[in-house]
């Protein structure tokens, strides 16, 4: 998503009005400087309209990029280096009740953080640097969809917790 479509901690993420199946996607997020070097880490939530995405692969941009489709925060952690795998946890609450909870680890990533950054910078430049969301390992089950006023909480070990209302 572009910067104007991203919200920070406590900012409201959105579900598309024309979507029937929307889910959050918790992702380790890298901050990469203009030279392609990873200089920081944060938490990301890459919202997805699964029903729109599933209709046709060409609809992926509409399913993933819209106002309020991404949140990033709560901070940029620097100098954490390669401390090994990090636990990632997501909880979704509705009306004070836990509706979904899932866990994974950065150990499940198929490519290294450096490989992802290198691939992004092969044919693109970012004068101010870029936040790179690395992909999700937690997706709620097919019978779950987000609702207005849900609270999405994503924690990554050593970085912090990002919480957003829907």
Task: Indicate where each model-derived feature is located.
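Short alpha-helix capping/helix-loop boundary micro-motifs
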Residues: 116-121, 137-142
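Conserved metal-binding segment of the jelly-roll/cupin
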Residues: 126-140, 154-157
């Amino acid at each position: 998503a572009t910067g104007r479509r991203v919200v920070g901690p406590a900012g409201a993420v959105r579900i598309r009005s024309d979507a029937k199946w929307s889910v959050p996607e918790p992702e380790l997020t890298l901050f990469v400087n203009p030279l392609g070097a990873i200089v920081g880490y944060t938490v990301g939530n890459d919202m997805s309209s699964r029903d729109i995405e599933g209709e046709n692969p060409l609809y992926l941009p509409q399913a993933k990029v819209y106002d309020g489709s991404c949140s990033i925060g709560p901070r940029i952690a620097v100098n954490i280096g390669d401390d090994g795998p990090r636990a990632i946890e997501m909880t979704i609450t509705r009306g004070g009740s836990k509706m979904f909870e899932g866990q994974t680890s950065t150990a499940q990533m198929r490519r290294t953080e450096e490989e992802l950054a290198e691939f992004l910078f092969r044919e693109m430049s970012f004068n101010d640097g870029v936040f790179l969301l690395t992909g999700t390992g937690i997706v709620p089950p097919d019978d779950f969809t987000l609702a207005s006023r849900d609270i999405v909480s994503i924690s990554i070990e050593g970085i912090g917790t990002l919480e957003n209302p829907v």
